[in-house]
Regions:
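Generic detector of low-complexity/intrinsically disordered segments
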Residues: 63, 151-152, 162, 173-177, ...
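Basic, Gly/Ser/Thr-rich N-terminal segments that form RNA-phosphate-binding interfaces in CRISPR RAMP
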Residues: 64, 153-155, 185, 203
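Low-complexity, glycine/alanine/valine/leucine- and proline-rich hydrophobic stretches
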Residues: 138, 146-170
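Long, compositionally biased interface segments
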Residues: 168-226
């Protein structure tokens, strides 16, 4: 699979041409990353790191001299990978309840009193929001504040999710053809098959128009319909 992925990245007209596919990691390196995170990565993602690449379609997992993390991740993004990924509806309800209790200036006798309560509320709201993605790695940056997540802890371990909170406040599972949350392997191989088939810029534009219309969309693009 690595050879085919290298060839895809080298091919012009794919949108990937000219990019270099990062090297694989060793078993020792993967274990170091897992020990630091306090988890064992889902087996298919582990095999990707060992046999295909430390990056590529996903953010590169690398050691910066002090710690292992995914390239481009915020310092606190992966602080609690060992915590089980929560039930989405329960976590969303807690977040919405917090926003309904957002302090209002008119309810306070002074600016100072309002700011003090607002700061306390903001800290609690931030913690609730972070808890919604505990146990999940920000594996791919989709731009505009959107991310694709790989769940590494809890009952949904091994499944792929889309973080659409930038606009809709929701986290949705990325569904396979059976309407179940896709695994990393399903997500990656589906992306690869679609990408490998797009050989010209014209074909790419036409295909993306179809996807946007809901026709033949790959797993990674299905968050609109999740």
């Amino acid at each position: 699979m690595r050879d085919r992925t290298v060839a895809l990245y080298a091919r012009q007209g794919t949108g990937l041409g000219g990019q270099e596919l990062p090297a694989v990691l060793s078993e020792a390196q993967v274990r170091q990353a897992e020990e630091q995170c306090g988890v064992e990565f889902p087996e298919d993602y582990r095999q990707y790191l060992l046999r295909v690449s430390a990056g590529g379609r996903v953010r590169r997992l690398r050691f910066d001299g002090a710690r292992w993390d995914w390239e481009g991740a915020g310092f606190w993004d992966h602080e609690k990978l060992y915590v089980p990924f929560p039930d989405h509806d329960v976590a969303l309800a807690a977040s919405e309840d917090a926003w309904e209790r957002r302090p209002k200036r008119e309810d306070h006798p002074s600016d100072a009193a309002y700011q003090a309560e607002y700061d306390t509320w903001q800290e609690a709201a931030d913690e609730l929001e972070a808890a919604r993605v505990a146990g999940a790695a920000f594996l791919h940056d989709d731009g505009c504040g959107f991310h694709t997540l790989l769940v590494v802890s809890g009952p949904m371990r091994g499944t792929m999710w889309f973080d659409g909170r930038a606009t809709c406040d929701r986290l949705n599972p990325l569904l396979n053809d059976d309407r179940r949350a896709a695994t990393f392997t399903e997500w990656y191989l589906d992306w690869f098959a679609h990408e490998e088939s797009l050989t010209t810029p014209e074909q790419r534009r036409a295909t993306y128009e179809n996807w946007h219309a809901g026709v033949g969309a790959p797993i990674w693009y299905r968050w609109f319909a999740s």
